[in-house]
Amino acid sequence: MSLVLLPNTAALTSAFLRSQDEVSDLVDDRVYTILPNSKTFPLVRVRRIGGTAGTRFAHWLDAPLFQVDAWADTAAVAFEVTETCRAALVQRFSGIYHFTGVSGVVTSVEAGGITEGFDPDEQTKARGRFDAVVMAHPAPDLTSS
């Protein structure tokens, strides 16, 4: 019997956001799970900050809590990027996904409200953020035997 491995939901979520035209129109492909040393703004980071995995009966369903941050030069752009990411996740992120290096099935997304402000580490950059729970489980094996 082989182990059931849950998908890397942070990688799945960031790949999904990069695939959305409305997001890429604002940030190109700058949706990260780890921020680069050399940053070009605006940009987005998806970071797992908690959550649970449904392991009581079967190791199958992951319910990670993510913090999604968007940085930009102005508060207006930071809000637009943040709300665009939130809307894309809540309205579209459901179903079977296969991106390079990561696959999974997203069953639901619950997102919190947006917090606005300036980043204490990047005081000249505006930041918007929200939290979201992305319910996901492994994608079905699409290979034939």
Set out the residue ranges of the language-model regions.
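Oligomerization/assembly interface segments of phage tail-like spikes and tubes
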Residues: 60-78, 85, 126-138
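Acidic-leaning, charged glycine-interspersed low-complexity segments
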Residues: 90-145
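Short, low-complexity, polar/charged sequence segments that are solvent-exposed and flexible
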Residues: 50-53, 63-67, 87-90
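Short C-terminal domain-edge/linker segments immediately following a structured domain
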Residues: 74-81, 97-102
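Charge-dense, low-complexity intrinsically disordered segments
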Residues: 3-7, 72, 122
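Small/polar-rich, solvent-exposed N-terminal microdomains that initiate assembly or binding
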Residues: 1-58, 92-103, 144-145
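Short, hydrophobic/π-rich interface segment
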Residues: 80-93
